[in-house]
């Protein structure tokens, strides 16, 4: 169950019995948090590892700076991307699929459905990123494939299953940085194609989503050639 509340000028979504995450968020607002490691620090995005009385967490602050008018109108039609991701993550984990990293708190400064600033508290997973592994074994490849196929069965997609978005925690594969977009057949097909591209995991599912994705790419490349551009 997810609870919505107001804290200062933020609309906050948190899981039931998530008072400790509210406390961590309030510490953030008071600049009372200990940063252990900085993962990203650019104009619109800050991602850090913080140490708290309750353990280590990922803290992400995102304040989009471009295409704000476009984002405003999209938000009126499509709603809030991160709020959808928060609800999807909660649902899938309650269904018993725990490979995806947990999403504990989402705080937003918004006007109507348009969000100017996001603050997120996310599970920190200790382990080895696949990008840091010199070689990926067949056993790990099998676990990667199963994790994505199980994710699809639970109505979510990765959106970008590259090596930086998987962590080997002990003997288990964990998935991070998931997509909150609708799990359409084409998006599921893209995940499977990306698994083959990144890991050599053969895609044996040639469904309507696969063919729509392939034909759409061919059409885009055809139009690019007409315009004198290189194909992608």
UniProtKB/Swiss-Prot annotation:
GO terms for molecular function: ATP binding; kinase activity. SUPFAM superfamilies: Protein kinase-like (PK-like) (SSF56112). Pathway: Bacterial outer membrane biogenesis; LPS core biosynthesis. It comes from the Bacteria. It catalyses: alpha-D-Glc-(1->3)-[L-alpha-D-Hep-(1->7)]-L-alpha-D-Hep-(1->3)-4-O-PO3(2-)-L-alpha-D-Hep-(1->5)-[alpha-Kdo-(2->4)]-alpha-Kdo-(2->6)-lipid A + ATP = alpha-D-Glc-(1->3)-[L-alpha-D-Hep-(1->7)]-4-O-PO3(2-)-L-alpha-D-Hep-(1->3)-4-O-PO3(2-)-L-alpha-D-Hep-(1->5)-[alpha-Kdo-(2->4)]-alpha-Kdo-(2->6)-lipid A + ADP + H(+). GO terms for biological process: lipopolysaccharide core region biosynthetic process. Its EC number is 2.7.1.-. Disruption phenotype: Insertion mutant shows reduced intestinal colonization of 3-week-old chicks. Pfam families: WaaY. Belongs to the protein kinase superfamily. RfaY/WaaY family. This is Lipopolysaccharide core heptose(II) kinase WaaY.
